[in-house]
Amino acid sequence: MYKRQAETGKNRVEEAEKASSKAVKAAIDYIRENYKKQISIEELAKLCHMSDGHFCRMFKKYTFKTPVQYMNSVRLSAAMDLLTRTDRKVLDIALDTGFNSLSYFIGVFKQGLGCTPTQFRRH
């Protein structure tokens, strides 16, 4: 009897893990498709049917990044591509890739790559 209860408990934990994993994957897909717009933690948590705190814990568990770190990495990749392929203004690239200000974009860029967007473009 106890063995069956333990197995049932284990199955419930596995089901919860699968559900959390699927929810985080849905959030990742949503970020990749919508990175150009402002995305809040609340929006992502609601999409995953989780509280904000639980969502952030699960997201970090599966991606090893916070949701904001992940969003910034997706946005940085897009910005790096635009900086390499176009002559568009840095401000326009920042805004078009979902950053809400030039100063935040430059700060995230420097933190992630060790140089400013302009320095990156020159090299």
Predicted feature residues:
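An amphipathic alpha-helical interaction segment
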Residues: 1-15, 19-26, 54
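Intrinsically disordered low-complexity regions specifically enriched for long asparagine
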Residues: 3-5, 52, 56, 106, ...
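Residue-level marker of regulatory loop/turn positions in helix-turn-helix DNA-binding domains and
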Residues: 16, 20, 33, 48
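Terminal helix-turn-helix DNA-binding modules in bacterial transcription factors
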Residues: 25-43, 60-106, 122-123
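Helix-turn-helix
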Residues: 43-52
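Short acidic-aromatic loop segments in the C-terminal HATPase_c
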Residues: 110
